[in-house]
């Protein structure tokens, strides 16, 4: 179990995703992780804890939209300030660099080096395509061996499953991606491959 603020991240709905990221990151031992869609930060924490354990000097660059949080009153607090405080409180601020903004206008337009890319942007195949094929540097890094994980892939996922991928590939007129669902049920972790 991954610890956060002295408590376990125990939402059963997401547990397999967090643990899947932890296990897969530990197998890969990446140095440079890029995460698109920080959300509540739990996936970030799972990968960062792994980096701490393998102690290879690895880091995570994560991207998130800034939005007011519930009860913040006129936008005085945001999800980004909460994330920054959370990462600092649990000692991950040396490993995790939090960036704010639209990933397409920030990272896809001007990508940084990576050996693991994790995409969780309320995924659709079109969004994943726009990230991966949106910049030649990103595409070439993946073709050279960088790993891509996505949230989704289980048959019960509403937007990211084999049926929706078949529809997407048919719309493009050729097979673009394949994937292997590694962990989880509806909320799942899959490894993506460019064909």
Residue ranges and their predicted role:
Residues 22-195:
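S-adenosylmethionine/decaboxylated-SAM
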């Amino acid at each position: 179990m991954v610890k956060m603020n002295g408590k376990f991240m125990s939402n059963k709905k997401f547990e397999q995703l967090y643990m899947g990221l932890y296990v897969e990151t530990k197998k890969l031992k990446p140095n440079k992780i890029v995460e698109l869609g920080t959300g509540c930060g739990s996936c970030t924490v799972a990968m960062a804890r792994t980096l701490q354990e393998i102690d290879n000097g690895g880091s995570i660059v994560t991207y998130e939209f800034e939005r007011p949080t519930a009860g913040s009153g006129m936008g005085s607090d945001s999800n980004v300030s909460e994330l920054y405080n959370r990462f600092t409180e649990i000692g991950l601020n040396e490993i995790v660099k939090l960036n704010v903004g639209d990933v397409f206008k920030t990272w896809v337009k001007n990508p940084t080096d990576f050996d693991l890319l994790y995409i969780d942007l309320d995924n659709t195949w079109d969004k994943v395509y726009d990230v991966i094929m949106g910049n030649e540097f990103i595409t070439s890094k993946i073709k050279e061996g960088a790993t891509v994980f996505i949230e989704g892939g289980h048959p019960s996922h509403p937007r990211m499953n084999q049926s929706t991928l078949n529809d997407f590939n048919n719309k493009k007129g050729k097979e673009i991606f394949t994937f292997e669902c590694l962990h989880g049920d509806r909320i799942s972790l899959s490894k993506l491959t460019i064909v």
